A protein has these predicted regions:
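Switch I (G2) and immediately adjacent beta-strands of P-loop GTPase domains
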Residues: 1-30, 37, 44, 49-58
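A near-ubiquitous, low-amplitude feature marking generic local secondary-structure context
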Residues: 7-8, 31, 63, 91
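P-loop NTPase catalytic nucleotide-binding module
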Residues: 37-170
Length: 170
């Protein structure tokens, strides 16, 4: 397939660096917005998103720290939509959260990427183990409760979620 080069500018989220971050966005064609699973959308996130919107910079939002105690993914998605006044489309969906976090589902192809826990906490993408979503339950890698929640969330997103629109994104 096609290969792409992504040049990332890692900017601080602290309010004291607002000017520098705003200036950095002038060099960007897109932005990756990180939302902490336990904190949700913070004030500085709203400000930076407003600058991206003003400059018509496409934004991908990523919820990180899913392997730590945090809020349910559907609640976070709702908060992102309301706080940023957007129609979010979930491209990936977490499999579990907190201590039950096991990986992600790529929704359009129903493929799973499983993660392994590290000895000091957190998760790492060691030898990427992928499989079809349909094979996840039989793999024994997630509990029946986690599998049921993932299936419930994915069904809800299929019925009531926003489809991904490249035109709207760009």
């Amino acid at each position: 397939g096609e290969q792409y080069v992504l040049n990332l500018i890692d900017t601080p989220g602290h309010v004291d660096f607002g000017y520098e971050v705003t200036r950095s966005l002038a060099a960007c064609e897109g932005a990756l917005l990180l939302v902490d699973a336990s904190q949700g959308v913070e004030a500085q996130t709203r400000k930076l998103f407003a600058v991206c919107r003003l400059r018509r910079i496409p934004v991908l939002t990523f919820v990180n720290k899913m392997d730590l105690p945090g809020r349910p993914p559907l609640d976070l998605m709702t908060e992102v939509e309301q706080a940023l006044t957007i129609h979010a489309s979930a491209v990936n969906w977490p499999i579990g959260s907190g201590s039950d976090f096991a990986g992600i589902v790529t929704r359009d192809v129903n493929r799973v990427a499983l993660f392994s826990k590290t000895a000091h906490g957190g998760a790492t993408k060691v030898d990427v183990q992928t499989m079809a979503l349909a094979d996840l339950a039989a793999s024994g890698r997630v509990s029946a409760d986690v599998m049921g929640q993932v299936q419930h969330d994915l069904e809800l997103l299929a019925i009531a979620g926003n489809p991904l629109s490249h035109k709207q994104f760009l």
